[in-house]
Amino acid sequence: MKLKELERPAVQAWSPASQYPLYLATGTSAQQLDSSFSTNGTLEIFEVDFRDPSLDLKHRGVLSALSRFHKLVWGSFGSGLLESSGVIVGGGDNGMLILYNVTHILSSGKEPVIAQKQKHTGAVRALDLNPFQGNLLASGASDSEIFIWDLNNLNVPMTLGSKSQQPPEDIKALSWNRQAQHILSSAHPSGKAVVWDLRKNEPIIKVSDHSNRMHCSGLAWHPDIATQLVLCSEDDRLPVIQLWDLRFASSPLKVLESHSRGILSVSWSQADAELLLTSAKDSQILCRNLGSSEVVYKLPTQSSWCFDVQWCPRDPSVFSAASFNGWISLYSVMGRSWEVQHMRQADKISSSFSKGQPLPPLQVPEQVAQAPLIPPLKKPPKWIRRPTGVSFAFGGKLVTFGLPSTPAHLVPQPCPRLVFISQVTTESEFLMRSAELQEALGSGNLLNYCQNKSQQALLQSEKMLWQFLKVTLEQDSRMKFLKLLGYSKDELQKKVATWLKSDVGLGESPQPKGNDLNSDRQQAFCSQASKHTTKEASASSAFFDELVPQNMTPWEIPITKDIDGLLSQALLLGELGPAVELCLKEERFADAIILAQAGGTDLLKQTQERYLAKKKTKISSLLACVVQKNWKDVVCTCSLKNWREALALLLTYSGTEKFPELCDMLGTRMEQEGSRALTSEARLCYVCSGSVERLVECWAKCHQALSPMALQDLMEKVMVLNRSLEQLRGPHGVSPGPATTYRVTQYANLLAAQGSLATAMSFLPRDCAQPPVQQLRDRLFHAQGSAVLGQQSPPFPFPRIVVGATLHSKETSSYRLGSQPSHQVPTPSPRPRVFTPQSSPAMPLAPSHPSPYQGPRTQNISDYRAPGPQAIQPLPLSPGVRPASSQPQLLGGQRVQVPNPVGFPGTWPLPGSPLPMACPGIMRPGSTSLPETPRLFPLLPLRPLGPGRMVSHTPAPPASFPVPYLPGDPGAPCSSVLPTTGILTPHPGPQDSWKEAPAPRGNLQRNKLPETFMPPAPITAPVMSLTPELQGILPSQPPVSSVSHAPPGVPGELSLQLQHLPPEKMERKELPPEHQSLKSSFEALLQRCSLSATDLKTKRKLEEAAQRLEYLYEKLCEGTLSPHVVAGLHEVARCVDAGSFEQGLAVHAQVAGCSSFSEVSSFMPILKAVLIIAHKLLV
C-alpha cells in the first residue's frame, strides 16, 4: 500500500542502510518533461518519516544541476566520518558524470559538487557502486563503454575491454556481484549479459538468449549465490524474466512470465533472496518468490508505467517506484487499507476550503465497491523471522533460543544458535503442601496430618471435615462420628440420671434379643422346679401353702358382657388376635403389646404398626423407624434440618452392608434439595460412607473456579480417605471413578507443570486402566529420563496397529466327495469386522490337534457365551458339511483362549490362523453355501442331519467362502474359511449320537433324527426364508444370499429347507439385576435428551438410539458380552450419572478399540452418538 508520494518527474536513489534518518534523493529525469517544459536539472533530498501520517515527504535539501539525470546512486563513501552522509553520483547526457557531497547539500554550506567528469561519449545510463569497496564506481554509456572509477582519484578511470572486442551498443545496466567483489556484469539491449573479471580485465562469460528476441532492460545478481543472476526483457513480444546460473549457462534455470508487456525495471531484495520486484508496461508491480515462481505481491499502478523500482536498503518492507506520469511513490509490501489514503486526501481538501470550521458531511452517491485492502506478501519475508523465541515444554520446562547480535559494520558470519532449557516454578506454596502430603502418605503419620489440618482450618465446615477424616483412620469410628455430631452416651447417661434421680445403665442394646422373653420364662420355670426337686416332699398342706400364699387375695376372671368379659373369653379360648383387636379399639395399647408378644412375631409386628399409625406424637416417627428398622424412610423423608440426627441414626442402627448406600442417599438429597451450606455439609456423609467419587463430585459443585490451591485441598482429602479405605479393604479394593480420575489427572498434570514429575507419577492410581491416566503415566515415566533407570516401564497406552500386514490370503481346499475335486473361491477384500462366536458346550467343533495351516496367534478372541438350556434348537446340517470352528472347545463349555493376530482390534486374522465360524447353510446339488448371518449363530447351535458320518483324512489347505455381512450392513459379503483339520466325506452307516467329549482327530458323531421327521423337497426358495416363529425371534435379520460352490456328487435329496425345520420359540430373558442400573442410566439419559432436544433430526436420532440399545439389553440378557465390555459399559453409565460426558466418551473409545467389532457394532456407535448429543445439549 502507498505510504508516501512525491510529484517529481525524476530519477531516484535511496540513502545507504547505515544512514539515519532515511532519505530519498531525486534528480530531474532526462527522459521526461514537466508541464513547464523546463530543461533545467535539479537534485533534491527528502526525508522519509513514516511516523508522519501524511503522504508528503519532508524537503531537506536542493541543488541546481548542470544537466538532467539518467541514473542516480547513493553510496556510503566517506560516511565513516562523523560529518559525512555519503556521496551521490549522477549520470547525465553527453557523458556527464557528477559527484555530490550529501552533507553539504543538507547543510547548504560549502560547495556540494565533489567532481564533474565527462569521459563517456554518450548518455550515462548505468551506474553502480561496489558493495565491498565503496570507492569503486562502475559507469556505462553508449558504444559499450564501461569505466571503473576510484573515488579517491577520479583522474584516470579503468576501462574494461576494448571497443574492438565489443560491438558498439548501449549499456542498459551494470551490477556488482554481491559475493565476489571483483565480478561485474553488464546488460545490453541485444539480449546478452557480459560478466567481467576485474582482475583479468576481460569478460569471462557471456549469457544470451537463443531466441534473439530478448531486449535486456535490467539485471541483478543473487544476494546469496554468487553464480546466479536475472535478466529482464522490455520487449512486449517476450516479457519474461530469466534466471541464469553461470555454471550451467547453456539455458536459463527458470523463465518467469507473469507480466503481459515488456519489463522496465528489476530489483532484488537484499533482505530476502527469494523476493524479486519488477515493474512493466502493463502498469503492474509484481513481487515474485523465486523459490516457487509464485507472484506473492501484486500492485496495480493505475495505468502508469513505472520505469524504476528499488527496495529500500534500511526498511526491507518498503520500495519506491518512479513512473512516467511524474510521480514517485513509496509502497509497503506488508499491505494496508485504501480507506486510509482516501481519508487523508479528503482531509487535505477539506482543510484547504474550510474557514476554521469543519465542512458539512457530503452525501456521495454509491459507487462501485473497490477492494478495500491490498493483501500483504503471501509468504512471510525473511526479515520478519523472529530473532528469538520461547516455548513451554512438558514438565514446566521453558525452551528459549536466540541469535547473537552482530554490529552493523561487520558482515554477519554463520554462528551456532544457542538453545536454553530452564525450569519454571510458579506455585511454590502448592509444591510445599504437595510435598507435605506425600511425606505424610509415605510415613503413614496421617493422624497428626489430619489434626494439623483441622487446627489450621479457618472455616468450621472444613474443620469438621478434617475431624471426620481423622476418625476414618481410627478404631471404633462410629461412636466417634456420633460424638462429633454432638451425641455421646456418657453425656446422655448423666442427663437421664439427673432426670430420673437415679443411675441408668445405657450400655445395653436398645432392643431385646429375639429369645430374651422365652429364655427368661424358662429360667423362671427351672428355678421354681429346682426348689422342689432338691428337697424332700413336704406335707400336702405345706405344699399348697407355698403355692398360694396365705395373705394373697383370690382374683376373679370377669365373665361380664362388657369389654373385659369379651377379653376374658378370647383369652380363655386362646384367640389372642381378637383380644389384641379389642385392646387396640379401647386404646389399651400396653395390654395389646403384651398380648401380641405372647401371640408371636407376626402379631407383635402388626400390633406395633397399628399402634404407631394410631398414636401420633413428636417422637412417634422416630419410634417407628427404630422399631421397624426402616432407615431408608429416615433418609428420604426426614427434614434436612435434622440431617445430623438422621446421620446419627444410621451410625447407631444401620448394618455394615447398607450403611454406605444410606449415607450416600442422605448426602445426595442434601446436595439436590438443600442450600449451598448443606451441599458442603453433604461431604461428611460421603466421608462416613467412604465414597471418594461422591466426595469429588460434591467438591466440584462447590468449587466452580479451579485453582491450584483448591485442587490441593481436594487431593489432600481424597488421599486421606483413600488411605483409610485401603486399611479396611486392602490396597486392591479401591478403584477410582471417572470424576476422581479426572481430578487426580488434573492434579498430576499441575504437579508436572511445576517440574515435580516423580511426585506427579506417585499420585496416579496404580491399577487404573483409563486412557488419560495411562497416557499421563507413560509420559511422566519417559520425561524423567535417567531418574527411572531400572524401573519397569508402564504399558504402552495406545493401541498398536500393524501397518501393511496381509490380512487375508487366497487358498484352496479339497473336498473329497466322490471324485474329490478341488475348488478355489476368490476372496473379497477384507473388512475390519470379525465374528468369533463360541460353539455350544455339548458340541465340540474343533479337534484337539491344530491344523498345519494355522499360523501364529497373538491376541485373544472375543468371548461369546454358549446358549443356555432355553436356547432354540440348532439348525440341521447337511451330511458331509462340517462347520468351521474358531477355537477348541472343552467339555462342559470351558473355553480355550486362542489369541487373535497382532493388529488393530477387530480386524481379520492373518493367513493360516483360524477364522471366525459361520453358521452353516444348506447344501444342495452343485452348491456349497454358508448363508447364515453371524448374529444368528450364538442362538442356533449346529446339529447335523441325514445318514452317514464325517470322517477326517489328511488335512488340506482351506478354501474361502463368502459369508454375509452383519445385520444392517449393506454391501457385498465377506469371506470365511472352511475347516482345515480334515476332508469331509459322506459315509453310509449306522447313525451315531453326538458325544459331549471331543472326538479324536476331528471325527464328529451325530444324533439320530426324530423318527417322525421327514426330509423336505429340494430347496426352491431362498435359503434364509425363515419361518414366522424364527422371524419373530430375530426380526432384524435381513435376507442373505451367497455365491456357492460345491464339488459334484452331493445327493440332492439330502438338501433341506430351513422353513421346514421344527420351530421352537424362545422367550426373552429378563435383564439380570446387576445390569438394571445400566439400563436405567441410559434410558434416563435418552429421556433427558428428548426433553431438551428441539430439532427434528436430533429427536429422530434419539428414537433410533432407543431401538438400537435394545440389542445391548438383549446381549446382556444372553450373557454374550465379554467381561471387559460389560465393565466398560458400567463405567460409561457412571460417567453419565455424574454428567461427565467427555470422560464417558473416552471410556467408550477405549472399550470400542479393545473389543471385537461384531460384538459391539450393534450398540456402541449409537451410544457414542447419544453421548455426543448429551454433551451438546448440556443435559
Swiss-Prot record:
Subunit structure: COPII is composed of at least 5 proteins: the SEC23/24 complex, the SEC13/31 complex and SAR1. SEC13 and SEC31 make a 2:2 tetramer that forms the edge element of the COPII outer coat. The tetramer self-assembles in multiple copies to form the complete polyhedral cage. Interacts (via WD 8) with SEC13. Interacts with SEC31A.
Residues in the signal sequence: none
Family statement: Belongs to the WD repeat SEC31 family.
Statement: the UniProt record of this protein carries the keyword Endoplasmic reticulum: yes
GO biological process: COPII-coated vesicle cargo loading; endoplasmic reticulum organization; protein transport
Gene3D superfamilies: 1.25.40.1030, Functional domain of the splicing factor Prp18 (1.20.940.10), YVTN repeat-like/Quinoprotein amine dehydrogenase (2.130.10.10)
Stated name of the protein: Protein transport protein Sec31B
Post-translational modification: Monoubiquitinated by the BCR(KLHL12) E3 ubiquitin ligase complex, leading to regulate the size of COPII coats.
A GO term for molecular function: structural molecule activity
Chief location bin: cytoplasm
Family matches, as PROSITE patterns: WD_REPEATS_1 (PS00678), WD_REPEATS_2 (PS50082), WD_REPEATS_REGION (PS50294)
Chain intervals for the UniProt region annotation (Disordered): 812-856
Location of this chain's protein in the cell: Cytoplasm; Cytoplasmic vesicle, COPII-coated vesicle membrane; Endoplasmic reticulum membrane
